[in-house]
């Protein structure tokens, strides 16, 4: 007797009970309580602060969902766990290190217990970080790496691996031959360099040859920069069929250039935004790596609580790993393409709620 026959021979009252039970179970599985359990997506157990403390944060800019996601993750997790976010500061752009030095210095006067830094440059921060440590402030690195041995812990991502993921998407694409125009990104940013090198190293391993058209590091990460550089590269190299950009705003500019020139080419990039969804669906954006800023922000708060209470910090790679001088956790990254972009849970990983407002900034 198969399962359908058994079901038909079951009394109607029992069948009704089973049906109602299945509905209740389904509701429970999608209830707010379950969402609460899943906000850290199983990466670390959630704890609350035994005693409130003050956390201040400075990031590079708030021009994209990556840094907005980090700030949302920090502020929302802090509310849930009894941590006070006393300052949110923004450097304004990559390279604005003097502005960020002043912001970090100001954290002393407002009594911050933990300073969180997404640096505007890789180098030059060690003296100011050491001065924070000397003042009794714990310092955490978020989102992108910084060259300092005085960081207590970091929540980052493996930028070399992100570059490799983008190259792998090109390798798997059907188009042959493959000719990739490189828009490397701003000079002096370590994450930019690592993604570039990761992409080129992985591209050399493709089963079908990949040729790369290089261009110089430099410029910003705005849409106009991506449009201008992609337009120039395609005009000088008519057989380009892929464009690499390390960040999504540059990538969307490159897509605009492809459309303007009516070219049969596709972009690979990183740091997903919802505006890129239709670009993926129509094939102009081949693949985008998800960078879960919200998860990074939540993890920073969870690790800060443990650091303040002298509790173990689980899952951290030791100092020396990935070329960094401090212990850190690399969040998992996922490639979004036509096969999965429609079902990706953006609100869990990278995009803050539409009604959320950025806190008062300095």
Task: List PLM regions with ranges.
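Periplasmic-binding protein-like
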Residues: 57-58, 108-119, 138-142, 181-183, ...
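Hinge/cleft segment of the Venus flytrap/periplasmic-binding protein
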Residues: 35-51, 203, 303-362
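Structural motif
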Residues: 39-42, 86-111, 215-236, 251
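Flexible loop/hinge segments that line or gate small-molecule binding clefts
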Residues: 122-161, 172, 179, 185, ...
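Hydrophobic alpha-helical segments within soluble ligand-binding/sensing domains
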Residues: 38-42, 100, 155-180, 194, ...
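Extracytoplasmic "Venus flytrap"
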Residues: 38-73, 77, 81, 86-101, ...
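Hydrophobic alpha-helical
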Residues: 113-133, 199, 219-279, 297
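An alpha-beta-alpha
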Residues: 55-63, 74, 85, 164-217, ...
